[in-house]
Amino acid sequence: MEHGRPLLSISLLASNRIGTIRRCLDSLLPIMEHLPCELIVVDTSTQPEVRELLWEYTDRVIPFWWCNDFSKARNCGLSEARGEWFLYIDDDEWFENADEIIRFFNSGEYHDYGYANYVQRNFFDPEYQTYTDNWVSRMVRLNDEVRFRSKIHEYLDPVYGKGKNIKAIANHTGYIYATEEERRKRYERNVPLLKEMMAEKPDQLRWAIQLVQEYYSAEEWKELERFCRVALQNENYKQQPVMKRLAATFYAGLVESVLEQNRADEALDEVRKAVSSENCSPLGVAYLLLQEAIGYAEKRAWNEAKECIEKYFALEKEITEDEEQYAIWQEALIVDSTYDMINKKKAYLVLLLCNLAQDNEAEVICLFLKLEWNQSVVYAYPRLMPILLELLVEHAKGTSAETIWRSIWDHKQLCDMMIEESRKYWERIAITKRTFLRENYHEQVMILLSRYYKPEILNGYTLCLPDIAQRALGLIDEIERGKE
C-alpha cells in the first residue's frame, strides 16, 4: 500500500431505501475496521432522514441528482476514490460475512490479481427462502482509464489482470417486489434504456443478452421469443467469438418462451436444434435438458422426462469442477443459474411427478424430502403445480400422496400459493368431491375445504371428520349452486 493511500475504496449508491440502508452499512463495518479503507456514498435520495443516516457512517457523502444513468452516478463515486482497489455496492445489498474479503487483502493475495468476484445472492421472496447465486465482479484494482460504462447494468472497463473468486456472499433484495406494478415499473425503466444503447451500438452483444433477461424476468414471452429468434439469426452476432458462450442465453430464452406459451412439442424441437449447435455451451445444454424434461412432463411422457433429469444431474460435476471455465460459461444469463437452488428444485419436482405417476412410493418420499416443502417449491416452477395436483387426485390412495397433501395443508402460505397458481385444478378437485368423501380421504377433504374456509375454523373440526365431510359436501354444493 502506498503511503497515506487507502488500500480499498468502498462506494455505495444510496437511494430512498431507508429500510435496508443501515443493514448494508453495518455489513461494511468489519471491512472498514480490518482494512485501510474509505467509504464514499453517492446519495441519490430525496429524504432528509437518509442523509442523516449516511453521515453516521462517513463524511464522504456526495449528493447526486438522479438522471436515469447508473454509470454517471457510479462514476461520481469512482472519481473521488483514492484507494488501490475499488468495491461498489447498492443499498439493498449486504454482506453476510466479509471475512474472505478481509483475508484476501490482509494476506497480500490481492497483489497477484486485477479484479475479484464474490457471490451475489438474489432473493425473490420476503422470507428469503428462494434465491439464486451469481458471481459478480464488483472489486477491481484501480487504473487511470477505468470507468463505469452503460446507463444500466453498468460495468467497469478497462480492467486488467487475472480474476479471483472470493467465497463471500452479498445478499440482495432488489428482486423482491411488493406489487406487480413495482415489478413492471422496473421493466419499463430498463427496457427503453437497453433499446437505446442497442441502437447506438448494434453489434454489442452485452445489451442483447441483458434485454433477453429483462423480457424473461417480466414474463414477456412473445417478445422474448421474437427477440431470441432474431438474435440467433443475426450475422453480426454470429461472427463474434463470444457468441460461442453467450448464444446459450438466446436458446434458453427461446425454449422457455415457447414452453410458457403452451407449445411443448415445438419447445422440444427447439431443444434438439439448440443442443446440436456448436454455439451452445455445455452449461446451456444442461439448462435445456431441464427445459426438455419439463416439456415431457407437460406431455405426461414420464420416462423421457426422467431420462432428461438424470442427464442434467450427470453433467453437473463435469461442468462445475473447473471453476474458471464454469465462470466463463456463466456469463450467459438465464443459463448462469442452471444449477442454482431454484432450478434444482425444478429438477427434483419433475422427478417427483414422474415417480408419483409411476407409483414409485419410496422415490416420491425421498424426493419430497429433498424439496424442503414450502412456498419456494411453487416459486420454482408454478407451471408444474397443476400437474402435481392432478396426480395427487389420480393417485390419492398412496402413502406418498397423503404425505404431500398433509404438507400442503400444514403450510398455509404454500397452500394459498398453490390455490392461486392452480385454480382450475382446485375446481377439478371440487368436482371429484364425492370420491373423496366416499373413500374417506380425510386429509384431502381438509385441503378441499381450505379452498373455501378459514384455517382457524377448520382446525376446530379435526377431531370430527365425518361432520367435516358433510360440511364439505354442503358447502361446495352451495358454492357451485351460486355459480350457476
Residue map of PLM features:
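A conserved acidic beta->alpha catalytic loop
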Residues: 27, 39-54, 66, 90-94
